C-alpha cells in the first residue's frame, strides 16, 4: 500500500481479491495509519473488523479489514467512483490454492475510468505545464475524456502588461471542461504550485498530482513511435 500511495498520492485504495471477496486492509492506531479501511467501511456501509477478532489491538500483524463479495464488485466500485476522490488499485487472483498468484489488474481514478461512469457529464483528466520567466507565465494545457476520446490542447502566455493572463485563460478552460483529475507540472521548485492551485480555485481539490520535473521529449518520441 505504501508503494502505491507514494506513486498515486494519499487517496489511494487497494482492493485485493481474497477467495470470493474483495478486501481492504489497513492499520489505524496511535503509532501509525496505513490504508483507509475504516473510511471505506463507512462509505460503503460494510462491516469493519480485524483479522483476529479476539485481539482488540490492530497492527501490521492484526490489521483492520473490510470487504464485499466479488459478485457485488460493480455495485461497490461504482459507489467509490462516485466519491470522485480515490485512485483504486484492483488486485485480482489467479490459480488454485495453494498456488495463488495476485496481480494488479486495473487502476481506476476519477479521470481514468471508462467502465464505471456514473453520469453523462464530461470527465476530463487534464495535464498542465507551467513555466515562468521574469514573472510572466507560459502554460500548456492538454485534457482528455477517456470515456469519449474528446481531447483539447491549448497553449497560452501572459504579457508584461498582464502577467496573470495565462492563468486567467487556464481558469476558464478548467471551468469549461469538467475536470475530474489534474496533473500540474513545473520546472523545479521556483514556482509555487499551491499558489497556482489556489488561483485556479483548485486549492482543496482532492485529485491533484504535482510534479516538479518534466518528462523529456525523448520519452514522448519513444512512446508514440
Q: What are the functions of these language-model segments?
A:
Residues 1-225:
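Basic, polar low-complexity surface loops/patches
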Amino acid at each position: 500500500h505504501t508503494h502505491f500511495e507514494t506513486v498515486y498520492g494519499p487517496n489511494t485504495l487497494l482492493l485485493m481479491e481474497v477467495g470470493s471477496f474483495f478486501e481492504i486492509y489497513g492499520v489505524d492506531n496511535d503509532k501509525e495509519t496505513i490504508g483507509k479501511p475504516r473510511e471505506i467501511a463507512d462509505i460503503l456501509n460494510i462491516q469493519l473488523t480485524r483479522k483476529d477478532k479476539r485481539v482488540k489491538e490492530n497492527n501490521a500483524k492484526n490489521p483492520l479489514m473490510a470487504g464485499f463479495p466479488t459478485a457485488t464488485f460493480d455495485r461497490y466500485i461504482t459507489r467509490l467512483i462516485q466519491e470522485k476522490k480515490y485512485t483504486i488499485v484492483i488486485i485480482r487472483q489467479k490459480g488454485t490454492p495453494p498456488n495463488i498468484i495476485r496481480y494488479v489488474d486495473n487502476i481506476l481514478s476519477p479521470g481514468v475510468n471508462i467502465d464505471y461512469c456514473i453520469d453523462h457529464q464530461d470527465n476530463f483528466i487534464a495535464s498542465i505545464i507551467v513555466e515562468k520567466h521574469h514573472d510572466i507565465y507560459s502554460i500548456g494545457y492538454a485534457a482528455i475524456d477517456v470515456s469519449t476520446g474528446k481531447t483539447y490542447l491549448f497553449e497560452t502566455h501572459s504579457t508584461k502588461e498582464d502577467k496573470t493572463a495565462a492563468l486567467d485563460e487556464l481558469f476558464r478552460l478548467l471551468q469549461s471542461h469538467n475536470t475530474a483529475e489534474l496533473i500540474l507540472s513545473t520546472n523545479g521548485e521556483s514556482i509555487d504550485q499551491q499558489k497556482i492551485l489556489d488561483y485556479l480555485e483548485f486549492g482543496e481539490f482532492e485529485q491533484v498530482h504535482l510534479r516538479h520535473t518534466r518528462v523529456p521529449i525523448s520519452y514522448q518520441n519513444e512512446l508514440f513511435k
